[in-house]
Amino acid sequence: YTALTGRPALPPKWSFGLWLTTSFTTNYDEATVNSFIDGFEQRHIPLSVFHFDCFWMKGFEWCNFTWDKDMFPDPAGMLERFHKRGLKICVWINPYIAQKSPLFGEAMEKGYLLMKDNGRVWQWDMWQAGMGLVDFTNPDACSWYQSKLKALLDVGVDCFKTDFGERVPT
């Protein structure tokens, strides 16, 4: 099959190393993350990637693609410090924009959210109240979403954990 369709690219070597995550830690900052990483170094356990789960953003504003300034006042500097420690950085994202997110109004106004048959924005409360789903069938919505990812890459994020793609409405 792949002889006809093409061989997949080999992921970068660092992606096969050990990943550490905040997972369900809900109240963390750079000092907390450093304590996690320091614990691994003290035990001589090599890490390749540190993954920031959802609370790198303000709680219940997922996804706003913006570091929580109260917990991470200098994201670019922090990521540079982690890179100097030899780590790659991953952040959690999903295809939903919370009603509480500053991006919700923008996405709704520009028609970037999935719509119901009645012309209203499709919203769901499964993960957080009033989530809208980015309409990835809209090329402008895709470009808008990609611009949010590019901004994160530009500040030093190396990869993304793309979550909740399985919950697309039918």
Q: Can you say where each PLM-predicted feature lies in the sequence?
A:
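Carbohydrate-recognition beta-sandwich/jelly-roll modules
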Residues: 1-48, 76-81, 88-89, 93
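Aromatic- and carboxylate-enriched substrate-binding clefts and catalytic-loop regions
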Residues: 46-170
